[in-house]
Amino acid sequence: MISIIVPVYNVGSYLPKCIDSILKQTCGDFELILVDDGSTDDSPQICDSYKEKDARVVVIHKQNEGLVRARKTGLQKAAGQYICYVDGDDWIEADMIEHLSEKMAETGADLAASGLYCESEDSVQKLHGKLEAGIYDTKEILSIMLYTGEFYEFGVSQFACTKLFRRDLLWDVQIQVDDRINCGEDVAVTYPYILRTQKICISDYIGYHYIQRAGSIVGCFDSDEYDRNKILIAYLKNIFDRSAYAECLLRQLNQYAKNLFLTRNIACFDVLQKDEILMPYGGIPVNARIILYGAGKMGQSLYRYLKGRDSIEVVDWLDKNSAVYQKKGMEVHCPDCLEKIQDKAYDFLLIAVNSQKAVKSIYRCLEEMGVNAEKIKWLREEFIREDYFILDAFA
């Protein structure tokens, strides 16, 4: 049997589509466990209505304690030998669970992993890890599972919801996750779980639809973000420290930590600086005039930081998908606007993208537009190469 666990918290408008997609699964024997994590909308009633109509549905109502506790609660109730997680505001293709379970049966793998569609109102993006489809002995991929060596690429994607787990291996991994973790909950499960496997199966199949909700992303920022990120990194460091492969795992974790703080709290790199900021970029004068290129997670992190400093002037914020971000209430413009901005109107153009491959393409485009190459800045090579730049803080 397969247990599909769905943590639910105030997702009433999305939940029916999620549940319907699961109940239409083509695989034979499965149960759906809905864990209502103290919802205050109509989610509890929706869960109960499905339980009344379908014997495969199990509903648990509990007080709000977060995603980690909700997953633990669902796992404790699960009767299946295999576990799949689905978020309550997402949905899956009808053959997803069957595909993953067949892969595990055919290969004898301890984990089956696939990709997902990241969907917003205006775009759909396919997301996979870097590893090609195939069967891997775990020892083969440990050195690149979290970081391939190119900033920033995952070897195996972090998403728990695109994977099928063995319950007996998942139990200890999930139960020991620090309940305080509410950032990177998937990372806290996926990679510690892989350490317990012998063989994993990577599929190029995509059957999971991750839905990005409407609304301004820039506004979604908590003052305790840095502390929450530190809890996650410290938790993973403790696990990796005890592994026989600690050296290569910690090296990857360091790179992941850099990426995490770049995209969520870039200010942490400048704690001891006075005359310059953005040390990952090699240092930018505190009174500089900046054009920001990139409005994804890293761009939003950087924009928040710069707008919070009175001495910095953000001349413009650019992204080729500006129309998408404008609908979310963000003041982002098309890169073509650069042609109207005089060279003397700004000091630096900062590329706020965490993909080394994408940066190379952006550099070429900017140079073709006549942007002064000396003004274009991205992460300095020393910052990317340094193996223990971040983890020294978690000694």
Summary of predicted features, one role per range:
Residues D29-G38, V58-Q63, D87-G88:
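Short beta-strand/loop segment that forms part of the nucleotide-sugar
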Residues G88-S203, Y208-D224:
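Donor-binding/catalytic cores of nucleotide-activated saccharide
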Residues K62-A78:
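Glycine-rich, basic loop-to-helix element that forms the pyrophosphate-binding segment
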Residues I83:
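Short aromatic/hydrophobic "clamp" motif used to bind/position activated sugar donors
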Residues L262-A395:
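Hydrophobic, well-ordered beta-alpha structural blocks that scaffold small-molecule cofactor pockets
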Residues Q198, Y205-R213, G219-E247, R264-Y281:
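Catalytic core of nucleotide-sugar-dependent glycosyltransferases
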Residues D20-D29:
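Short, acidic, metal-binding catalytic loop of nucleotide-sugar glycosyltransferases
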Residues S21, D36-Q45:
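A conserved acidic beta->alpha catalytic loop
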